[in-house]
Amino acid sequence: MARIAGVDLPRDKRIEIGLTYIYGIGLTRSQEILAATGVNPDTRVRELGDQDVAALRNAVAGYQVEGDLRRWESMNVKRLMDIGSYRGRRHRAGLPVRGQRTRTNSRTRRSAKRTVAGKKKAPSKK
């Protein structure tokens, strides 16, 4: 099993897909890395040689991935909260940050709705 950037890549996947298991590397960046290192994207992870793995490690080391990227993102959010910007206040309140509506929807960000058992709607007066 190839270990790159502290992540064990799945042995049976193509290396193009396997690299996307590293936080911060998507399909496009994976393809860029493979083109730069000269590794065939259709190669399975288990078929990689030691030289290929070393070349991939060096290429991935040039990007901000995994723990460093997570830390960078959390520091940016913390900075927004500390300066008291609108986005920071929305993060702190656990509400959508990018202008989505909240009267309806936004359940993921606001937490699941709890229904009270036995509570009925008031009968409508006619």
From Swiss-Prot:
Q: What is one GO biological process annotated to this record?
A: translation
Which residues lie within the region annotated Disordered?
Answer: 91-126
The record's listing under PROSITE patterns reads: RIBOSOMAL_S13_1, RIBOSOMAL_S13_2
State where composition is biased (Basic residues).
100-126
Give an example GO cellular component term for this record: cytosol
Q: TM spans, by residue?
A: none
| Name of a matching Pfam family | Ribosomal_S13
One MF term in GO for this entry?
rRNA binding
Q: Which SUPFAM superfamilies does the record match to this protein?
A: S13-like H2TH domain
Q: Which InterPro entries match?
A: Rbsml_uS13_C (IPR027437), Ribosomal_uS13 (IPR001892), Ribosomal_uS13-like_H2TH (IPR010979), Ribosomal_uS13_bac-type (IPR019980), Ribosomal_uS13_CS (IPR018269)
- Keyword set, alphabetical order: Ribonucleoprotein, Ribosomal protein, RNA-binding, rRNA-binding, tRNA-binding
Q: What does this protein do?
A: Located at the top of the head of the 30S subunit, it contacts several helices of the 16S rRNA. In the 70S ribosome it contacts the 23S rRNA (bridge B1a) and protein L5 of the 50S subunit (bridge B1b), connecting the 2 subunits; these bridges are implicated in subunit movement. Contacts the tRNAs in the A and P-sites.
Known partners and oligomeric status: Part of the 30S ribosomal subunit. Forms a loose heterodimer with protein S19. Forms two bridges to the 50S subunit in the 70S ribosome.
Q: Which family does it belong to?
A: Belongs to the universal ribosomal protein uS13 family.
HAMAP family under this entry? Ribosomal_uS13
Protein name as annotated: Small ribosomal subunit protein uS13
Organism source for this protein?
Acaryochloris marina (strain MBIC 11017)
Recorded name of the encoding gene: rpsM
